[in-house]
From Swiss-Prot:
<dbReference type="InterPro" id="IPR050619">
    <property type="entry name" value="Flavodoxin"/>
</dbReference>
<keyword id="KW-0285">Flavoprotein</keyword>
<comment type="function">
    <text>Low-potential electron donor to a number of redox enzymes.</text>
</comment>
<keyword id="KW-0249">Electron transport</keyword>
<dbReference type="GO" id="GO:0010181">
    <property type="term" value="F:FMN binding"/>
</dbReference>
<protein>
    <recommendedName>
        <fullName>Flavodoxin</fullName>
    </recommendedName>
</protein>
<dbReference type="InterPro" id="IPR008254">
    <property type="entry name" value="Flavodoxin/NO_synth"/>
</dbReference>
<keyword id="KW-0813">Transport</keyword>
<dbReference type="InterPro" id="IPR001226">
    <property type="entry name" value="Flavodoxin_CS"/>
</dbReference>
<comment type="similarity">
    <text>Belongs to the flavodoxin family.</text>
</comment>
<dbReference type="InterPro" id="IPR010086">
    <property type="entry name" value="Flavodoxin_lc"/>
</dbReference>
<feature type="domain" description="Flavodoxin-like">
    <location>
        <begin position="4"/>
        <end position="165"/>
    </location>
</feature>
<dbReference type="GO" id="GO:0009055">
    <property type="term" value="F:electron transfer activity"/>
</dbReference>
<dbReference type="Pfam" id="PF00258">
    <property type="entry name" value="Flavodoxin_1"/>
</dbReference>
<dbReference type="InterPro" id="IPR029039">
    <property type="entry name" value="Flavoprotein-like_sf"/>
</dbReference>
<keyword id="KW-0288">FMN</keyword>
Amino acid sequence: MKKIGIFFGSDTGNTEKIAKLIQKYIGDNVSCLYDISNTSQKDIEDFNFLIFGVPTWYYGEVQCDWDDFLPTLKKINFSNKIVALFGCGDQEDYSEYFCDAIGTIYDILKKNKANIIGKWSTEDYYFEQSKALLNKKYFYGLILDEDRQANKTEYRIKQWVKQIIPYFNTH
């Protein structure tokens, strides 16, 4: 069995594309992709190492498939799981809600005792507010803006994967 589960929700295809890039850099020999719209509680419980891709829609909302999955997510005990988060948002048109969906998922995971890794610097992002902030210098996970900074996406993914992969290899 592959040891890292990469779960994503995607309406436009951006988050799915990013999930596939993350899988490419981690290695498809050790990771599996799951669309959250076709995911069961057991699918997540089968992995100790998880990556969740959560885009933000409109005014800070969780993408519709993730929104449908939230009641199930709230039931899962994450105490023996390591979880990394990535998300997509638009820092210009939705500057006051930038990647808020990551904050929503983070709160559920923390409440359910997940070990969350993969914080990402806020440097070079321009937004007013975000519920995805660990503090003023870091987001809870990798934040990507395919609308305004698509040219930085692949570099950011490579750097983030380098940061998180040791956690998956040593636990």
